[in-house]
Amino acid sequence: MGKKYTESVKLVDKNALYTVQEAIELVTKTSKAKFDETVELAVRLGVDPRHADQQVRGAVVLPHGTGKTVRVLVFAKGDKVNEAQEAGADFVGAEELVEKIQKENWFDFDVVVATPDMMGVVGRLGRVLGPKGLMPNPKSGTVTFDVAKAIADIKAGKVEYRVDKTAIIHVPIGKSSFGEEKLSDNFHVLMEAVVKAKPAAAKGQYIKSVAISSTMGPGIKINPGKVLE
């Protein structure tokens, strides 16, 4: 472990449960790398992801974005090609893009949007896009005829969240350079979305644990009972 990491760890009491404000203040102090570190939120939920009725998945536009340039690939035909290009899509196409991905193992994009009529074509990529979390999905607003709005939302800082096999959601909420106020705004918008997405089948405590960390910094635990304060 580097000297900077060791210094950062000293600032954090690993047994403490901090308030949101304290944690965000600490995450900016413990971000000491030479690059602008990403701040990530990890939320452990009281759900069993093996059951279809306990899946937690959705998308939300963070008020201050993530600080990351997002490359958008759109599968569309006809008029929707122009609409996607005008809205700022980085790549637009149909079968030829499917072939490019299959043959060249090409993944120079971060989000995939598709019009519903293209899902038959995109479905052929399920095995390669699925494991990377890139498969378009109506729940996250990436399967839609309104491609202009989908692209605008993504470029504005829309993030997808979904519970993994261990019932944890990992989502970036910005860069350490954002400062406390912007990180706090993004944190609250995301947590409110996750709380609203609670499945009816989930029993007991829903928000089990919450932590934030910068790319190279230690994890900072937040009191799960105070995340919406």
Curated annotation (Swiss-Prot):
Coiled-coil stretches noted in the UniProt entry, renumbered to this chain: none
Annotated transmembrane regions: none
CDD domains from the UniProt entry: Ribosomal_L1 (cd00403)
Pfam families to which the protein is assigned, alphabetical: Ribosomal_L1
SUPFAM superfamilies linked to this entry: Ribosomal protein L1
Cystine crosslinks: none
Keywords: Repressor, Ribonucleoprotein, Ribosomal protein, RNA-binding, rRNA-binding, Translation regulation, tRNA-binding
InterPro entries named among the record's database cross-references: Ribosom_uL1_bac-type, Ribosomal_uL1, Ribosomal_uL1-like, Ribosomal_uL1/biogenesis, Ribosomal_uL1_3-a/b-sand, Ribosomal_uL1_CS
Record's signal peptide: none
Listed GO CC annotations: large ribosomal subunit
Gene Ontology process terms (BP): regulation of translation; translation
Keyword RNA-binding among record annotations: yes
Subunit structure: Part of the 50S ribosomal subunit.
General function of this protein: Binds directly to 23S rRNA. The L1 stalk is quite mobile in the ribosome, and is involved in E site tRNA release. Protein L1 is also a translational repressor protein, it controls the translation of the L11 operon by binding to its mRNA.
Family the UniProt entry places it in: Belongs to the universal ribosomal protein uL1 family.
Cross-referenced NCBIfam families: rplA_bact
Protein name: Large ribosomal subunit protein uL1
Organism whose genome encodes this protein: Clostridium botulinum (strain Loch Maree / Type A3)
